[in-house]
Amino acid sequence: MEVAGSASEWAVGFEDECWWSRVALPTLNACSPDGEPLRLIQRSVARDDPEPKALSCYGLYLPQIDQTWLRFVDGRPVSSITARFLGWCSQKLEAQAKKVLVLIWDNASWHISKELRRWLGSHNRRLKRSGKGVRIVVCLLPKQSPWLNAIEPKWIHGKRKVVEADGLLGAYELAERVCRVFDCPHHEHLTVPQKVA
């Protein structure tokens, strides 16, 4: 990480996924405007509510530039969506004249799957041939130490900042709030491409 941090063409990134719930309340110590302890009320979603109870989100924290890039997911994190997120991050880093991303993440099943390892190998070989793009060097965190991921505290503080004390947020409004907290645009959600028969 020290080598990557000192090279101008290298970027260090901490990647993780997070679920943002419309109903679950974070641990929070706060006071209301009148000085009384803030009381959060557990909400529930109506059975016929078409919106999801929670949104999955990919994030890449880049400490060198103090930015966190987010993409929400329609569905849950899977290898194919992880590959799309990494491709998107690579394009953004290439636009910033970066050549290598040192990617630090946990041992989630979709991070170590054959599908994603194949994609990473193909991605790195393709850019080696063309000379264009951002090489991705993966560093797995120890299995028993996921808290070493520097993006984890950002998720916790973000959940405290987006909580709604007076009602239930819609899924889009929740995503908008999360993006405002992380000072990033709300991009189109990532989806698993539909296979056409």
Predicted regions and their residues:
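Extended, low-complexity cationic-aromatic segments
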Residues: 1-88
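C-terminal anion-handling pockets and recognition modules
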Residues: 9-10, 134-135, 144, 148-197
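Mobile genetic element proteins and their domesticated derivatives, centered on retroelements
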Residues: 14-16, 59, 86, 106, ...
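Acidic/histidine-rich, metal-coordinating catalytic segments
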Residues: 16, 98-112, 141-144, 149
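A short acidic (Asp/Glu
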Residues: 23-26, 113-117, 151
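RNase H-like polynucleotidyl transferase catalytic core
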Residues: 37-48, 123-153, 166-167
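Short, basic/hydrophobic alpha-helical segments
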Residues: 81-102
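Conserved Walker B catalytic segment
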Residues: 116-124
